């Protein structure tokens, strides 16, 4: 599981700059819950072969009682509760402030590792920085310059070194599919889960200290075994009531990472929101097989149905590989069809592709449409083989493959998916270029 790193500090100490540095300006997820004046931002970063989740909180005032600052503090408190590590950022130029001391007092009670990051410290003596901020009682200050990148790699190495390496979940002998049900609050996720598990199923409560952990629930349906990666904010015996569900972006992202197949639940009575699109985008980025269930279809008339289909086409057009179902989770209508698509998507995600057939498919694609030149060189693709599952990865070997345009990569992805009838899963292509060892030598 990716470690979650939360950035905390008073306003204008450089949290957003460090966030952009840690995520290399990749698109962030935003918790766009109504009424939030300033949203938390979520992004994925990578250093070497390690991935991590970064959360950028608004300027934090732990003693705020009302108004905007209180709302921002509430959001920061939620992020702190879900953190694996806290980066407490202070401003080396302006020095230690009473606001910093208030935040430090709160973080000492957080029960999480805290790293004291002194930003804007370029050109400053390390001993001077350490002397002033040691008084906070949070260990050795770590000088960085988020804007210039100085000290950031050392900071990441220190933080990530405290966590075990990422380990992909092993498939059991029966290759039981792991399913995550995700979506915004009140779209019908828990009702859908009840349709799968049955209302008398006992589901564990969140226990103290485990609020961040997704619960794995084995279940059987139509003679097939599955594991549900459950993230609902409320888990109880019998019906799960949507009205008190707590939405956690971090839990959602972790469930997606652990799953083989994700069921994205949408609400037919509401327009597709930015948050829906952000969640869908993360599913795609994670490479997970996907089934989309548009719930509450029985509650809307034909006019509304046509509008929502147009909205889906416009805002989720990047999910062309997924099957869409229009269901009523409350009545159980369409749930069986969703599970049939889950099975098909899982089979596609775990498919084994033969090297000869992959190479023939690639050669046919090249004959139909050659890759464009880059300068004086045209990419040469010699053979292809499978490099992994969940999602399927096709590795193409050749020469001058460093600058294949994205449009041509998409063309190859579509070609492979159509040739192998892969429905419900994205497909990734990786290039391996044979570099000339004599270049640059006399």
Swiss-Prot record:
One Pfam family linked to the record: MMR_HSR1
Gene3D superfamilies found in the cross-reference section: 3.30.300.20, P-loop containing nucleotide triphosphate hydrolases
Domain KH-like: 351-435
Protein name according to UniProt: GTPase Der
PANTHER family (UniProt xref): GTPASE DER (PTHR43834:SF6)
Key words, A-Z: GTP-binding, Nucleotide-binding, Repeat, Ribosome biogenesis
Binding, GTP 1: 9-16, 56-60, 119-122
Record: residues binding GTP 2: 183-190, 230-234, 295-298
Residue ranges occupied by any EngA-type G domain in the UniProt entry: 3-167, 177-350
HAMAP family according to UniProt: GTPase_Der
Matching NCBIfam families: GTPase_EngA, small_GTP
Subunit and interaction comment: Associates with the 50S ribosomal subunit.
Reported function: GTPase that plays an essential role in the late steps of ribosome biogenesis.
Residue ranges the record marks as coiled coil: none
CDD domains: EngA1, EngA2
Any one GO BP annotation for this protein: ribosome biogenesis
Protein family: Belongs to the TRAFAC class TrmE-Era-EngA-EngB-Septin-like GTPase superfamily. EngA (Der) GTPase family.
InterPro entries: G_ENGA, GTP-bd, GTPase_Der, KH_dom-like, KH_dom-like_a/b, P-loop_NTPase, Small_GTP-bd
A single MF term (Gene Ontology): GTP binding
Biological source species: Aromatoleum aromaticum (strain DSM 19018 / LMG 30748 / EbN1)
